[in-house]
């Protein structure tokens, strides 16, 4: 199993490749992350109507196409999606690329019913020993572990399936809502980790606290925090003892 806990420094994780430096969830974003230097490349996995797994954060085509089209990503076939977003890779494309380079991979599974398929593909490409698969879905985590027990899995919290934290109209409400979720988190985390078999707690920085980090570590789990894009916030979460930090711009880690 891949190294998940903090050693002499926190693990550096490029969010959606390097979303600040290239179109997110593309091989170009992966390459930019590798150029800067990361320990893991994170990306999202979503299913299409034809069963193809692709790299996309949500079902909102407006978001995935960066404003070029509207509709539902999951209602499209691969050839239809590629007419709108030609550079969007399939999950197999991503695994093929990552198998050819030296970096860890973090697959954030957005499709609850495809955990078996995701784990089997990671195994087929020989990447189990440097992979983490995470999800908000307990079903997906169960299926991932059932298919490949050696695969490290992470429980994502809170769920942001529809990218609400990125929507401007909701932005003023997000910090308070997230803080409320974080208050009860320390006492709930040990039970959730045990129930899901998760090796990592993937936590939004807004719910993070010293108590949450300590409870996870006491339960034998690592703590990775998302999405950290400011130097002051980076210093704060590192001081709390997190094991991994996810950022849109991995150049932040060089400061």
Outline where the language-model segments fall.
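Phosphate-group recognition and catalysis centered on beta-loop-alpha active-site segments
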Residues: 1-255
